[in-house]
């Protein structure tokens, strides 16, 4: 009986691990497809895709699954993009922390229902995104390709526009960081010099970190983990340390 119990426990544990791994694989392949739709399939130009593929390799995601996800994101399959759209939701969690959830969904009613249920479970409440965004700073992380041929022009624009946050990633790529309210102006200046942004990522950081009591930490962790497990979730931002 003891041997049977041990075998049953091992089987149950393996089954739970397989389910967890399957959810991770689903989320990674979804991110690959979305990244390809937004920024193309060339990893030399799409640095977001490169990072996702590195993560896929860490989890030993099969190459055929990766390729299928990439194929879904190619230009010939843009009908996928029409079926789904990006949404963002916000709310207050335990101890009053603010949480922003970014989603890519093909059914906004289902998504908001799932998110609302999680907030209710932890006695939180959903609010309008515009009501809480003042609590965060918004930056664009921008990649510029082909620096070898345009380095002098790029550095000149950076200097004239007082862009202080920039770095050269390798001999052919540079990353610059621009505040949200300056993005359109800076983009226009670069375009006037025939320099195109090859990858653009919005980064959101809280203006102040909200220190929470240890009593609430486990609740907040559990809540955020449940939100992350939703297949539609692409990113979660909050204003505390856990």
UniProtKB/Swiss-Prot annotation:
<protein>
    <recommendedName>
        <fullName>Probable transcriptional regulatory protein BCc_197</fullName>
    </recommendedName>
</protein>
<dbReference type="Pfam" id="PF01709">
    <property type="entry name" value="Transcrip_reg"/>
</dbReference>
<dbReference type="InterPro" id="IPR026564">
    <property type="entry name" value="Transcrip_reg_TACO1-like_dom3"/>
</dbReference>
<keyword id="KW-0805">Transcription regulation</keyword>
<keyword id="KW-0804">Transcription</keyword>
<dbReference type="InterPro" id="IPR049083">
    <property type="entry name" value="TACO1_YebC_N"/>
</dbReference>
<dbReference type="InterPro" id="IPR048300">
    <property type="entry name" value="TACO1_YebC-like_2nd/3rd_dom"/>
</dbReference>
<dbReference type="GO" id="GO:0003677">
    <property type="term" value="F:DNA binding"/>
</dbReference>
<dbReference type="Pfam" id="PF20772">
    <property type="entry name" value="TACO1_YebC_N"/>
</dbReference>
<dbReference type="InterPro" id="IPR017856">
    <property type="entry name" value="Integrase-like_N"/>
</dbReference>
<dbReference type="GO" id="GO:0005737">
    <property type="term" value="C:cytoplasm"/>
</dbReference>
<dbReference type="GO" id="GO:0006355">
    <property type="term" value="P:regulation of DNA-templated transcription"/>
</dbReference>
<dbReference type="InterPro" id="IPR002876">
    <property type="entry name" value="Transcrip_reg_TACO1-like"/>
</dbReference>
<dbReference type="InterPro" id="IPR029072">
    <property type="entry name" value="YebC-like"/>
</dbReference>
<keyword id="KW-0238">DNA-binding</keyword>
<comment type="similarity">
    <text>Belongs to the TACO1 family.</text>
</comment>
<keyword id="KW-0963">Cytoplasm</keyword>
